[in-house]
């Protein structure tokens, strides 16, 4: 059995894979890219992934379970932030030695699909500032092109949760990271949070930006000829916002 940190037995849907195939992919990713944090593969997580992968799932149900999953992802990503020791006094006048967040954080969503993750971040980080980056493919060069950015003025002093539910070719996320670095954000302070990734996308992210951290719920097998993740979810933004 592949030993994946912080995970239990890897449950595999036999419709698209075998245990050995999926575990081999996950083991390879974890071994080669130590900055990838894979969520613990519990039955609850796999059940939610099954619902949002199902093409027959109606929009309302898709959004409900996607939101649940996103919140769990954000909670997992918060573990990657630095903490400092803090002592408080309980209502029983007894000291408790705990911790508190050490640094300011903000979210940055890659428009449009990344906006689906904003409410999950706000739900667990009250008052968290959120910026946006819009990236589209240049029809002439086929390369990602920055169209729009609206980010906190002090973003260089913050840890950044970069939000995009899918990591296929990683063109958009790499462009977004480029923008953040240009604005003074430290590479090691960027945490890329996504639901589903392809091995090709992960490899590109860490080839270009090895100090970034990535938190994901699942890693799939590959990309198809249209650069969709397989077995995948489909177009997450279209399904979430009902624009299919």
From Swiss-Prot:
Transmembrane segments: none
Cofactor comment text: Binds 1 Mg(2+) ion per subunit. The magnesium is bound as Mg-PRPP.
Reaction equations catalysed: UMP + diphosphate = 5-phospho-alpha-D-ribose 1-diphosphate + uracil
Residues the entry annotates as binding GTP: 59, 68, 102-105, 129, 158
Pfam families: UPRTase
Required cofactor names: Mg(2+)
Binding site for uracil: 229, 234-236
EC numbers on record: 2.4.2.9
InterPro entries given in the database record: PRibTrfase_dom (IPR000836), PRTase-like (IPR029057)
UniProt GO MF annotations: GTP binding; uracil phosphoribosyltransferase activity
Keyword GTP-binding: yes
Regulation of its activity: Allosterically activated by GTP. Binding of GTP leads to 5-time activation of the enzyme.
Effect of residue 150 to A: GTP-induced enzymatic activation is reduced 4-fold
Keyword Glycosyltransferase: yes
Subunit: Monomer. Forms homodimers in presence of substrates and homotetramers in the presence of GTP.
Function field: Catalyzes the conversion of uracil and 5-phospho-alpha-D-ribose 1-diphosphate (PRPP) to UMP and diphosphate.
Protein name: Uracil phosphoribosyltransferase
Organism expressing this protein natively: Toxoplasma gondii
Lineage, highest ranks first: Eukaryota, Sar, Alveolata, Apicomplexa, Conoidasida
């Amino acid at each position: 059995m592949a030993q994946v940190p912080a995970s239990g037995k890897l449950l595999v849907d036999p419709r698209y894979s075998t245990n050995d195939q999926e575990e081999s992919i996950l083991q390879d990713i974890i071994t080669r890219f130590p900055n990838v944090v894979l969520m613990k593969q519990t039955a609850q997580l796999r059940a939610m992934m099954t619902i949002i992968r199902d093409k027959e799932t109606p929009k309302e149900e898709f959004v409900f379970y996607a939101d649940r999953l996103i919140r769990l992802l954000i909670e997992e990503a918060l573990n990657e932030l630095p903490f400092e020791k803090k002592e408080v006094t309980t209502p029983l006048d007894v000291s408790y030695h705990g911790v508190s967040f050490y640094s300011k954080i903000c979210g940055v969503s890659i428009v449009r699909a990344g906006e689906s993750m904003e409410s999950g971040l706000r739900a667990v980080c009250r008052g968290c500032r959120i910026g946006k980056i819009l990236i589209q493919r240049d029809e002439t060069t086929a390369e990602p092109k920055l169209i729009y950015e609206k980010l906190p003025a002090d973003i260089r002093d913050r840890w950044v949760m970069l939000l995009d539910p899918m990591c296929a070719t990683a063109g958009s996320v790499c462009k977004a990271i480029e923008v953040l670095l240009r604005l003074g954000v430290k590479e090691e302070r960027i945490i890329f949070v996504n639901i589903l990734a392809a091995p090709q996308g992960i490899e590109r992210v860490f080839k270009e930006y090895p100090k970034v951290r990535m938190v994901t719920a699942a890693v799939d097998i590959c990309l198809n000829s249209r650069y969709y993740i397989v077995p995948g979810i489909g177009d997450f933004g279209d399904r979430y916002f009902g624009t299919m």
